[in-house]
Amino acid sequence: MTANKNQKKTYNFKSETKELLHLMIHSLYSNREIFFRELISNAADAIDKLKFNAISAPELYENDTNLYIRIFSNKNNNSLTISDNGIGMKYEDIINNLGTIAKSGTKEFIKTLNKNNKIKNDLIGQFGVGFYSSFIVSEKVIVKTRFAGLKENQGVIWTSDGKGTYEVNEINKKERGTEVTLYLTKDHYEFLETWKIQNTVSKYSDHISIPIELNTYDEKEKTYFWKQINQAEAIWTRPKSEITELQYKNFYKKIANDTNDPLTWTHNKVEGNQEYTILLFIPSKSAWDIWNRDNKHGLKLYVKRVYIMDDAEQFLPNYLRFVKGIIDSNDLPLNVSREILQDHKLVYNLKKSLTKKVLQVLHSLSQNVSKYEIFWKQFGLILKEGPAEDSENRTSISNLIRFSSLLNNTQKPTMSLENYVKNMKQNQEKIYFITADNYASAVSSPHLEFFKKKNIDVLILSDKIDEWMMNYLIEYNEKKFQSVSKDDKSIEKLVHEQNSQNETYQENMNDFLNRAKKTLSDKIKDIRFTHKLTNTPAMVITDSNEMSTQMAKLFSAAGQTVPTIKYILEINPNHLLIKKINNEKNEKKFKNWINFLFEQCLLAEKNTLDNPNKFIARINDLLINN
């Protein structure tokens, strides 16, 4: 409907908005006071926007730079008004912001609400629909607003009961900014009480740097006055000794839209060539959109305590995108933009410093095993992006990565590289690892039979990112990494030390190798005997310079051309099946057995075959004729 600003107009909420309102009103009862948090947060954001826009257009202040948020409790009509003298809204803003929800995450939010009526309240803030929480406690909501710089007769009033329609009209409004009046339902009258308002503000908004004032009755003077009920000082500007643990946690919950406590945090003021303050938090739970690298993330940026922007991703690398917090710089210009940040030398230096600081915080956190297990479960996969992205800090990142390992005998990733190296065998030259589709496939792989027998530990990697990560983890503590599924002299050296009979077997079974090599000449790179196997007749490995099986799978999943891998076939001369095949004089049957053996190895290695039907037919033939 086209808006005619000269008269009151009634609009219908869009269907999606109706559904959201219904769900919020009927589902979010576990913590009704969240509406307070959201409305005060919106008011603070409006004042931040005014301060930012007034840098280039000071006339927006309208000769009034005394900024505040005010709460007015009216017990005569059971209404609660939260007002601010921030940027305000235009007529079009009211229609776009309060009449329809145009945010991309709304459908996902509704879907989540439908799935779980016990949805956590932090999702309200995450999805940007906090204003609508007003209807949890109200039977009617009235919004009066005027955009800074517009005439007094260009104010706007918005009214709704949240049941499907809303009214909009122009009004005269002397003060710029926005006031939201909630007409509370009977079971929410407690929010009119001074003690309840003060407790709620203290709980959620004490850290907000803008004064929050409450209309308070002076018994002596028999009059009302505006009493400030918050500290109105940015928490990061205060000395650490004056900030309680609870205040830090509440500040985190506000900026991160999270109801969970953070795992840890760091608060530092840096002086010298660059002057800045940081307050950074490590969450205890990942955000719903953390896995999308392209989604907005980053720190809140302030310059000389003036809010500049959210999601300033230039200050931390992508693999630390889970970090929440603020940076307040004294050196960046107040008119800084995202484009300027991209190439600003100061930002580059800040990013280096902040990255090292976060890695130090994570190292300290890793000393607390139980807390670090929580961190790794939530953010380990993201941190694994680090070795490829950040060569400068690769060693520090390596110290933070946790692995499952063969000798730990558990899927839980608790092994650090420091501990692995500390427990290496005396004659062990390298750090051994195996990559697989999952933990079960890895631990049952024939590649590990020798290591199990000799009690040599192997790191087990079963996340999709692992193969890619290991291309960048070349060595640690002067020990090179080595895949057990690749040809390697250090492994052969360990095997040879344990088995001096290898040459004898080669002499006794040379004919077997020649016949097998002739049969598989176009399919394999080489064939040889090995004593790495104890229970398995044969396995395949890749040449040291060949693409690994897991990397080939990654290429294939990404739709890229995968080069043909020619494997090395390793034969266990002690196995009964190998001895049986060696005794087979019928050349046709021998070839069938060798092809079966090779295809069996490919299936174990790749979990798939190019032609499974041919493999089944071969098995059937061998069963019938033997």
From Swiss-Prot:
Instruction: Name the InterPro entries for this protein.
Output: HATPase_C_sf, HSP90_C, Hsp90_fam, Hsp90_N, Ribosomal_Su5_D2-typ_SF
Localization, UniProt: Cytoplasm
**Region A, annotated ranges:** 1-338
Q: Write out the entry's keywords from A to Z.
A: ATP-binding, Chaperone, Cytoplasm, Nucleotide-binding, Stress response
Gene Ontology MF annotations? ATP binding; ATP hydrolysis activity; ATP-dependent protein folding chaperone; unfolded protein binding
**Region span, C:** 554-626
Please name one Pfam family that this protein belongs to.
HATPase_c_3
- Region B, as annotated, extends over 339-553
Q: What does UniProt give as GO cellular component?
A: cytoplasm
This protein's record includes keyword rRNA processing: no
User: Which NCBIfam families does UniProt cross-reference here?
Assistant: PRK05218.1
What is the purpose of this protein? Molecular chaperone. Has ATPase activity.
Subunit details:
Homodimer.
Question: What family is it from?
Answer: Belongs to the heat shock protein 90 family.
**Protein name per the record:** Chaperone protein HtpG
